[in-house]
Amino acid sequence: FLLFFFFSKNCIGQYRNQILFPGENGTHLLNLLFDNYKTSNVLSYTDARVKLYKEIYNVHDTVYCVYSHHGLYLDPNYSNPIDYLSKGGSNNGINCEHTFPQSKGADAGNARSDMHHLFPARAAVNEARSNYPYSEIDDTKTKTWYYLAEELAAKPKTLVDEYSESLSGFFEPREDHKGNVARAIFYFFTMYEIQSDRAFFESMRPTLCHWHMQDPVDSLEWKRTFMISQYQDGKANPFVLDCTLPQRCYCEGLINCISGIEGVKFEGADNLISPNPASDLIRIYLNASDFSITQFRIT
């Protein structure tokens, strides 16, 4: 069989990429993003949630929690999807998560219903997140693990990456939502800095920079930002469109990113391909130059 090792200095891929304002950095770039991507019009908070549940995050009439993948069927003929999914305020109902908490600056004006930072979440998990900053939590210190409708006090034996974690004062989303969180918060702080809690943002910034690289934009995130833009002056989240923006705005020293790799992530020597070990045939599609591949044949 074949065992592959990848060694990469600056290689990461997202679904697609558009370089915005090339050559610009720092404050001037942030001003350009504000001037060109700040929406003047958003839906009401009620209408925004209806769009999220019936269109943006509706998968074959089911809405899934971004933190636990808990899904609820939504009757397409029901007149009030907010009420339908809440299940009377049940812990297993689904409500709306403000990635940048309302108490930290998203409670007024367009910020409250800007869909670029709103996500469906299981009620109990949303409550556990509260207004806590996002953080990497030591697994040995995690208080509660969340997956589907489960809430575990001990570390799960399988599917660990599918779980979100909470600890008093901190919250860690599941692995495949970390990049989405980072890009939503970079967007929010760029567009609504004047009303945002800067200390709250700064406490998360290094972690968000890492998560942006760890979990690049996939096809769903790319599709959804354009779906949202239809209701917000045609303006997508620029941090989804251009993977270099965090580095140029908030994450000085962050490694470079590349585009054109769907479903495969390259993160230094930690990356694994599947299947690995492999036999017979495996295909790898690359769009990068600064990497090396070492192949060992073991008999």
Residue ranges of predicted features:
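C-terminal outer-membrane/trafficking sorting elements
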Residues: 263-299
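N-terminal module-boundary/linker segments of secreted carbohydrate-active enzymes
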Residues: 11-73
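Short alpha-helical segments and helix-capping/turn motifs at coil-helix boundaries
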Residues: 45-52, 79-80, 103-107, 168-172, ...
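Bacterial Sec-dependent N-terminal signal peptides
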Residues: 1-15, 261
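Domain-level detector of nuclease and nuclease-like folds
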Residues: 84-258
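Short, polar loop/linker segments at the starts of domains and inter-domain junctions
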Residues: 79-83, 111-112, 284-285
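Short, His- and charge-rich active-site/binding loops that engage polyanionic ligands
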Residues: 63, 70-93
